[in-house]
Amino acid sequence: MKCYNPSAFVPMAVTLVTVVIYLGVFIPLLIIHETVPSAPDDPTLYNGLNLTEAWLDLQSLSDGYHPFNSRKNDDVRNWLLKRIDEILDHNQIQYTTENETADTSDVQLESDFDKDVPESMSGPNNFNDDSVEYHEDLRTRKVSPAVTVFNDLRSNYSSNALTSIGVKGRRLGISTYFEGNNIICYVRGNDDEEGEWWKTGSVNSKGKMHGRGGVMVNAHFDSVSTGFGATDDGVGVVTALQLIRYFTTPENRPQKGFVALFNNGEEDGLYGAKAFLSHPMAKFVHTFLNLEGAGAGGRATLFRSTDTEVTRAYAHAKHPFGTVVSSDGFSSGFVRSETDYVVFRAEGYRGLDVAFWQPRSQYHTDQDDAKHTSIDSLWHMLSASVATTRSLTRDTSNTFVGPRSDDKIGKVSNGKGSDGVWFDIFGTVFAVFRLRTLFAWSLTLLIASPLILFAVSYLLNRQEKFYFFAGSIKSKNPEDEPISLGGWRGAFRFPITLFITSAITFACASLINKINPMIIYSSPYAVWSMSATLFFSVFWFIMAGCNFVRPSALQRGYAFMWMFVFGWILLVVATVYEDRFKISGGYLFVFYEAAIFLATLIAICEQFALPRKSTYIEDSQNDHSDNQDHHHQAVMGTDGANGADEPNADDEAAEEDQEETVNATAFPHETTPLIGGGQPSHRASVSTSFANRYRQVVPESYDGPADHDDKKGHKKHPYGGEQEWSAKLPIWTWLVQYLLVGPFILVILGQVGLFLVAALHQTGTDGSPLFLPYLIVAIFSILLLLPVTPFIHRLTHHMPTFFFLVFIGTLIYNLVAFPFSPNNRYKAYFQQTVDLDTGVNRVTLVGIEQYIRNIITNIPSAAGQSINCEANPRIRSGLSFCSYEGIPPQVVDNVVEGVPPEKGYSDWLSFNVSRVPNENKATFHISGVETRACILRFDDPFSEFKVHGGAKSEERWDDVPDSGSDQIKLWHRDWNKEWVVDVEWAVGEDMKPGDEGRSGRVVCLWSDANKRGVIPALDEAQRFSPQWTSVVKLMDGLVEGSKRRVGELVRVGGWKKGRRDDFSLALGLAFLLAYV
């Protein structure tokens, strides 16, 4: 019975270790990636939190679409104010409310709001619990109440944003005026100033600091017009509510002040967060935690962080999750979407961005509801938020106080932060350290590792034990032929195989991208399996084939050397990016190269066990002489006992056997056959094709090559025809090398690979490059399988055979399968535009043309129409805009039964424009019905604008960029309110002020789709589109209604004037005709 040494470098042991390592790493990784830690069975396990209450709040909050431009948004806002009151009353906290309006500030000393909140959104619990102990210290502080709630109806925002990055040429801006209606809840900390300090001094006072600064948690309570907003951002909102409950519980009283910001208007342009910056409380905030949702459930990940110190607060979470690679994606411009985090970071706050991130197919759709998330996901974000904010509010050091590192005037004085590196391990351990530390490690590794390898190689060479790159050596006897050591055998196998295999892997990814590019949308694991099994199978076939033809004991060592060289080059690039661009994701290559360096060092150091080359040559010559003598004796030996002078048949057979023995044990030289000669092979069967090569007799108890003779004096032979001196190599060092380059490296690489693919595999419907996720899968498949490549030639044939069959199956599936399903729905972007002058309406569906045309064929109102599709990179690059005439909208309730809706279009929007004499300036009066969002769109850029009654422009932003703007977005906090806007444009060459005007359109937006029949074209698209499709909003408004009139006699840049001007014009024309 054979007994294998588990540490011997033989196929059975290598195969077993490979299976154990890869399964032991990837089974936990996949479980963590696909599941969420369970919520505690006791919903009140943590004092001050109530998970059941939070879940009921989420269900109430996500009971309908509530975009900023909808009546439901007001219901949600009033519900939030009521819930804050109920929480504070439940904790019996003395608090005040400040109803801040544009003109006055009314302060109430108790919560006595009587808001119109729908019954369905009433609070889930009765908070008048007599069992709650009354805490006098919190209710009656010296001067000030413990909590202040700001009902902010005063803060406004005015600025600009440049148009799409994908547009070539000079980019124009989109100017914006926004009236905010945020809710701010301030919980006073023990170290905070007493009194209403926020009322002292100017809002824009420079460098003013109150106490030791505050900690803010931000969440937006508006949703998109086609999503219920459960995770975007309902979970964040109810988490902030629970944090108010937590910090107003006496045992959890914060040392530093805590601010909960419920901002409104994030989905349309981060407007709520920008409006907050003009509020007095903005100067109090030093650190923040932004809660977001870019998926629908799963784990909440740490998207990004401003610095190392604030990230250490997140490390206190029980189940941390995230990697700095995601932060690098944003900072490098690779990810172009943004959250409120970018607003607060630009203001100088130090903080974190925590968000849900998958599945993206449910993001902004009607599946972003409580049914498609879970209480476990809610708990994951809530528990991480509590741990983070508790750490920040208890930090009384100077970490977040003091002069800034950038010395920028006007920013909060919140200390000096350092760029950081962070990542989790199995969702349990969180590593955080400074980027400068990583840079020091990188630089040290770049310099020290090659020097150490060269130094050890030099010592080996001095001792005549460096067998790498060793050729033929002449013996002391000049008559003897040079003896080959075989040191170059296998030197270039690894790079050639890696190049060929990688090229085939990328070619396969390109093939899928060409034939069925969206398959990764619903089947990312099929693509992973295809890519990984292809690389593994091809790599094994080439390396095992080379080893079959010319076995080499140095193949493993050469593989590590090449891996070290390639890794060193990548580390150079990573180090440059760390230093120049502050990119921290290079930690992957630092750990990778460190592990490969140690494995390479072992591969070199194990040659200390080999004999000196000169000694080996002498021993080989002696063995050769002994073998010749033995052979001579076997042939010429006496047969006196038999008295026979002639050899018989048995003697001839014995002679042949002896000759074979001599030939088998003779040292190989130039005349040795390439295949079939050499020493007895002890290699197990690698494959059916190679079976004969390894069917050689070995002792039953053989457990691999040894580095010396066994106890019985039997000489140990090299493995499978490898160089004879390799019999002296240790048999266990491969296992140490495998453990170095295997488990830990696979964990950090596997987590990042799974994270990136999960984040990007469903972005193709957004217009992102379709090949990108396939490229990432191919790259990480290679990186994840590189640790096994130095040992791959010792694997049995069973693994590559099985993997090749898996590759064939997944390849066929990826080529022919339909890429979408009800669980992974394709996103079609919807918008309906109406010309309010002519009554013409067009429905536009945006996406990949192949699938959009498929969807439109199922829509009844589009039947028989010619569908026109064209690109519009200014709005969404990479997608097609396909339009048809749709069912007229009824967003304004002025439709008379039996009368076509378009007859009432003219009443939806009215405007008047007056020209300032002798100036390039005009004043617009705009009114929309059942909307609080309108837009002025110009055909040519303007240089300045001002909204009457608006707040003073912030110095931190320009209302209009240097390139000029061609749009002004106007957002009211009130309904059906008129805008009065002054617009001014530059004087052209050879022109005088007042000689030229501007043409364009006045547009108003409608976004409330809660009631069926209001936007029947949207209802129809959602009802009749295939089950693998979801219809989501394209722009700020689901419906855009616009007016335009060009008349040269009353021209102010082509704008339609009011009715009085139209009447005057008509009267003048009538007199002119009568005269003629």
From Swiss-Prot:
Cofactor entry: Zn(2+)
Site (Transition state stabilizer): 363
Glycosylation sites: 50, 99, 156, 912
Gene Ontology BP term (one): proteolysis
Compartment(s) of residence: Vacuole membrane
Binding annotation for Zn(2+) 2: 232, 267, 364
Active-site residues from the entry: 266 (proton acceptor)
Region annotated Disordered, chain positions: 619-662, 701-720
Keyword field contains Cell division: no
Residue spans, topological domain Vacuolar: 33-437, 513-525, 578-584, 760-771, 821-1076
Positions contributing to Zn(2+) 1 binding: 220, 232, 292
EC number, UniProt record: 3.4.-.-
Family (UniProt): Belongs to the peptidase M28 family.
Protein name: Vacuolar membrane protease
